[in-house]
Amino acid sequence: MKTSIKEYLQEHDKAQINDLAAALGKEGSKDFRDLVKTISLMERRHELKFEDDGSLRLAQKKAPAITLKGIFHAHKNGFGFVSLEGEEEDLFVGRNDVNHAIDGDTVEIVITKVADRNKGTAAEAKIIDVLEHSIKTVVGQIVLDEEKPKYAGYIRSKNQKISQLIYVKKPAIQLEGTEILKVEIDQYPSRKHNYFVATVRDVVGHVTDPGIDVLEVLESMDIVSEFPEEVLKEAEQVPDAPSAKDLEGRLDLREEITFTIDGADAKDLDDAVHIKLLKNGNFELGVHIADVSYYVQEGSALDKEALNRATSVYVTDRVVPMLPERLSNGICSLNPNVDRLTQSAIMEIDPHGKVVKHTITQTVINTTFRMTYSDVNDILAGDEEKAQTFKKIVPSIHQMATLHGILESMRIRRGALNFDTNEAKILVNKEGKPVDIVLRQRGIAERMIESFMLIANETVAEHFTRLKLPFIYRIHEDPKAEKVQKFIDYASSFGIQIYGTASEMSQEALQEIMRKVEGEPYADVLSMMLLRSMQQARYSEHNHGHYGLAAEYYTHFTSPIRRYPDLMVHRMVREYGKSQEVAEHFEQVLPDIASQSSSRERRAIDAEREVEAMKKAEYMEDYVGEEYDAVVSSVVKFGLFVELPNTVEGLIHITNLPEFYHFNERDLTLRGEKSGVTFRVGQQIRIKVERADKMTGEIDFSYIPSEWDVVEKGLKSKGRERDGNRRDRRRKDKKVSKGSTARKDDKRKDSFSKSKKKKGKKPFYKEVAKKGVKHGKGRRKGSRTK
């Protein structure tokens, strides 16, 4: 009977029961009762439904849920967010919908709830499948455990977002419990078991080994110092000096007065410069870069390993090089008074900073001096003793300083943004323990060399763009309007008048904002906020210009010892012009090289930040209980981030403040309900160091009331009025050296802060929801700041 009912309704769309009974010949009392029972059963099974007029209709099959692919970002409390490519807003995933996904996994999701901009809640999603696991290996100390006799013990990941234990299969060697192991994941958490299972791949070291903490971070990211045997053998075959044959066909610049300018501890000297003042008033600037590509042949073991690494990694007490030291510190280092093969960008630059003529070619040089930044800065400051020591190049140094001023002014005129922020240098002893944190100095010499490298990179990029040849660019795309708007709102909270909308905001306008706040206590913080509103620079085979530099063309040509894209640019300088097949080859390989280089660069940055946060926290462990003056660097719903003069940043959680505080999202302030004490960015406050945790890289402060406290006018106050005169304050603080960046990519800043979304275009998932995605009930509400 069911088949007959379905066939009739398919043909007639809908029908009253009496009409259906008549059509099927079921009008008799018994047959009619059977018909009604069948209809009732089909309704319960959602095979048909009653319309408002009492007629019957076949139930439509539910449209299949639309699934999306994204990256899962876990929170240590169990929930997380999924980011989708090309979308600004992430989707919230409740702890019950995570489906055993791990931080960084590529996942398949369905949207269960759309965003509500009026309420400031984010869209919500459910993970239905893990497409690819991000974590393949884990590094950590083995904990011997007899509770699970089939395993040797377990490792607990340092990543706070991974709460599950990693059980380790018994290896062939006897473990003592002091080993730091690198293990390969065999099984991931699932419905069957909420833990990992792994196999020992390597013994990294022991907990008592000096520097093991840094090595553990590097190994956990698969950043390995040792080179494969095949690579080292190839490096050994590279000669110590160029031969006469190596010099054939090269422009001989050995008679030019060229010299290197680097940090005092630099060993890989990969760039040198020369300068001449021409009769027409222009400058000739030569930027000479070690010709690494001459020794690293494409497809060789050296080349494959260099591409795999793609960049050198610089952490507190060591460098993990892209190339073996025999090359980077040997024949590819432009040491004084020895012949070296180079590739050179020789530019004629007019008094306005415009390159009017250039040559890019293979050269040979012999540098005159190995200068340090401090040497050059001293000479420019009038140090007569240094000037006498290096008198042969003093005229060149002064000409270079003049040209640097011209180039810097040119960049400012066209709208280049200056993201100068304080950088810390952490000094460690032989055991790897931090003993001091100092600020990195950027004098004229440092900025001068930067100017010369920038103009060389621009010139090389424009040269190949105009030749319309496949090329690799360093691009920095325009910022998203939403992020610029957040920066505008942030800057406006300081009383800065800003004209125009975010979508119309030019580099010159942003530059003008930063010029207005020069010298203000919040200038550095505002500069950091501007930097965070930018997109991340990356490598690409397509030229999109460089927004931050306001440059139409840009590449990386000047550091082939430590960056693979630079090595590729050198290779193209040499190979182009040989045949049409060369261009076709580069066109084919460049996309993957650009992607690999960008990915490895991000990995290196993550490693550098994690080590820096760890070492800063370790340094501050010795200062727990001490009091200092600090500056508020960020205000969020859950508290204040404050920065010490040495750039160490810590959190004052809102629960550690003495009363209830109201958070003003627009002005980014916290104001005490009773006292009116108000905290805003750039304000100086007194703090006490409460906790420093090397393992997590976290530092906690507490607030101490002081004469620095600001009370908003019109509010009851225990302290001074905001516009009152400040008394001079001089305290003899115990030593915290000058010289930290925000901890681990500001993870703690974003952990609980759910900033409301601005009204704007309809999110893409509004449309997805209309196509039949079922909405969940009882999901956690909230949105987050990325």
Residue ranges and their predicted role:
Residues 112, 186, 633, 690-692:
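Short, surface-exposed secondary-structure boundary micro-motifs
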Residues 105, 125, 653-699, 711-719:
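Intrinsically disordered, low-complexity linker and terminal regions at domain boundaries
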Residues 106, 180, 354, 627, ...:
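Residue-level marker of beta-strand positions
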Residues 312-413:
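Conserved catalytic alpha/beta cores of large enzymes that bind or transform nucleotide phosphates
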Residues 360, 373-644, 658, 662, ...:
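Append "with occasional cross-activation on large, charged helical scaffolds in nucleic-acid assemblies
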Residues 711-786:
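Intrinsically disordered, Lys/Arg-rich low-complexity segments
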Residues 1-286, 293-339, 370, 375-378, ...:
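Charge-lined substrate channels and their catalytic hotspots, especially those that engage the 3′ end
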Residues 184, 253-260, 264-282, 400-414, ...:
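Phosphate-interacting basic helix/loop segments used at nucleotide- and nucleic-acid interfaces
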